[in-house]
Amino acid sequence: MKKIRGLCLPVMLGAVLMSQHVHAADNLTFKGKLIIPACTVQNAEVNWGDIEIQNLVQSGGNQKDFTVDMNCPYSLGTMKVTITSNGQTGNSILVPNTSTASGDGLLIYLYNSNNSGIGNAVTLGSQVTPGKITGTAPARKITLYAKLGYKGNMQSLQAGTFSATATLVASYS
């Protein structure tokens, strides 16, 4: 019996070392991508009606507040908005068909809101946190302000209708 026991250990050890190694390969893959969806922004219009040219203030006057309605399926974290307009930069939109060769023309200045009204200027192409957000998720509403001004010489402005567009994108982060 001692002889069998003595052989048992080397035989078992040899069997373990010589046996094929069984290894389970990863054969299930789980993947996807988590996203935070952008808000769906409704069209908004700011209409100044008739403005007398001589009443324009170069740095911006004729203030109008306006709201932008949106549907935000995700509303955790902080809302950020970005406003762009035909590749323009700075804090104003040069209204098409009102500018001269020297760059003079009608400007629209955009401002954020705060608890007491008008806030800081909005820089086109940069993210900003809206100062006033109302509504309950998913229906949200932000308040912004617009002012009319001009660049250059007031005499270069021509009477007539004007129109400009911009794109607002909103999401939470």
Swiss-Prot record:
Record carries keyword Cell division: no
Gene3D superfamilies (alphabetical): Fimbrial-type adhesion domain (2.60.40.1090)
UniProt cross-references to SUPFAM superfamilies, sorted A to Z: Bacterial adhesins (SSF49401)
GO biological process annotation, one example: cell adhesion involved in single-species biofilm formation
Lineage: Bacteria, Pseudomonadati, Pseudomonadota, Gammaproteobacteria, Enterobacterales
Organism annotation: Escherichia coli
GO cellular component: extracellular region; pilus
Pfam families assigned: Fimbrial (PF00419)
N-terminal signal peptide: 1-24
Protein localization: Secreted; Fimbrium
Keywords recorded for this protein, A-Z: Cell adhesion, Fimbrium, Secreted, Signal
Function as written in the Swiss-Prot or TrEMBL entry: Fimbriae (also called pili), polar filaments radiating from the surface of the bacterium to a length of 0.5-1.5 micrometers and numbering 100-300 per cell, enable bacteria to colonize the epithelium of specific host organs.
Protein name: Fimbrial protein PrsE
Superkingdom of origin: Bacteria
Main location per the UniProt record: secreted
